[in-house]
A protein has these predicted regions:
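Residue-level hotspots at or immediately adjacent to binding/recognition sites across diverse folds
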Residues: 18-345
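Secretory targeting and sorting signals
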Residues: 1-17
Length: 345
């Protein structure tokens, strides 16, 4: 289930702004059309990191005018689905997959050299996403192992990792898993709060921990599930209370009603969007400096909300898998065929 989103391949459509007052995506040439980027970390308006298929990691420090291939050596067979940057030089990247395909790499010199800091040795584990609370503390999550989601923890910025006990993790539902679609199935806000998105089971749930992954509570969402291709694919929290969930059915020939939901109580309850995005969405991010504004992206377009997820409207029809905004307001998107873009006003 975790890799199911990789099967969604739709042709890219030209990006175009829908209204003069709205921001728009400005495409940035990454120098490749063969890589699908599902990992993205926005540092600021000038600096961003991308990760994807073929073991690829790219970095720009000039607003996307130029991209440097800083891929770890010997990783061409890996899929880097999540990347978390601390700045222009320090970054941690997650490779997903069964068994030893799930790995974590870290660089402290902008990708000139890399250290493999974790390699999964449990054939039953499949890591999907990771998140950092600060420069030291972070978590990664795996699909259920022996009936419970597995959590990996670091306290030194991703240099070493430890599997946490699963005693505080609720039992997974039959068929439940995470979607490694955009690096946003595990997200955090503040020093200790973290949320995990699921799909594939009878109900699409969001699990919440307020103690950095030691104990968790589960809540149902209105996003449809009941199929390995359906559920919550991405989360975004602007603080520990207010969050957004997006997803649906990744299959291009299937509808995705109720593709978005929101919470105002740290994920204890979720309300469906009154006017959701018109199709499956794989990535979501809040816009800094605009309290109630957020973007959702997917293979068929980008949607904008200005009322904290109650209503969404189409902003762009280009194909993107993931989206991220930096604290300075710099927003980036990336996806199939080497696509990358920066949001412009």
């Amino acid at each position: 289930v975790a890799c199911a989103a990789a099967l969604a391949t739709l042709p890219a459509a030209p990006a175009r702004a829908q209204a003069h007052a709205d921001p728009h995506w400005a495409a940035k040439d990454t120098g490749t059309t063969s890589v699908r980027f599902r990992g993205l970390s926005a540092v600021d308006r000038r600096t961003a990191w991308l990760s994807g298929t073929q073991g690829t990691v790219l970095r720009t420090t000039d607003g996307g005018a130029h991209w440097r291939n800083v891929s770890p050596p010997g990783a061409a067979d890996l899929q880097f689905r999540d990347i978390e940057a601390f700045d222009a030089r320090r970054v941690v990247v997650l490779a997903i997959g069964e068994g030893e395909a799930s790995r974590v790499y870290r660089t402290d010199d902008g990708g000139a050299t890399w250290t493999e800091s974790f390699r999964n040795t449990d054939a039953k584990a499949f890591y999907d996403c990771m998140t950092f609370f600060d420069r030291r503390h972070g978590l990664a999550m795996s699909d259920p192992v022996d009936g419970r989601f597995r959590i990996l923890s670091t306290g030194d910025g991703g240099r070493t990792w430890t599997v946490l006990p699963d005693t505080g993790m609720p039992a997974a539902l039959d068929g439940e898993a995470g979607f490694a679609a955009s690096g946003q199935c595990l997200v955090s806000a503040g020093p200790k709060d973290v949320w995990l998105a699921t799909g594939g089971a009878a109900r699409a749930r969001v699990l919440h921990s307020a103690d950095r992954g030691l104990t968790w509570t589960a809540a149902d969402t209105p996003v449809p599930a009941g199929d390995p291709a359906r559920g919550v694919f991405a989360l975004a929290f602007r603080d520990r209370a207010h969050g957004l969930a997006v997803g649906g059915d990744y299959r291009a020939d299937q509808p995705s009603p109720r593709s978005a939901a929101g919470t105002g109580d740290a994920g204890r309850t979720w309300r469906p969007a009154v006017t959701p995005p018109p199709a499956y969405r794989s990535g979501v991010t809040w816009l800094p400096h605009r309290r109630a504004a957020a973007l959702a992206v997917g293979p068929t377009g980008t949607d904008l909300t200005t009322d904290a997820g109650r209503t969404w409207r189409t902003l762009d029809t280009g194909s993107y898998d993931t989206v991220d905004c930096a604290p300075d307001g710099g927003c980036w998107a990336a996806g199939e065929q080497g696509r990358a873009a920066r949001l412009e006003n």
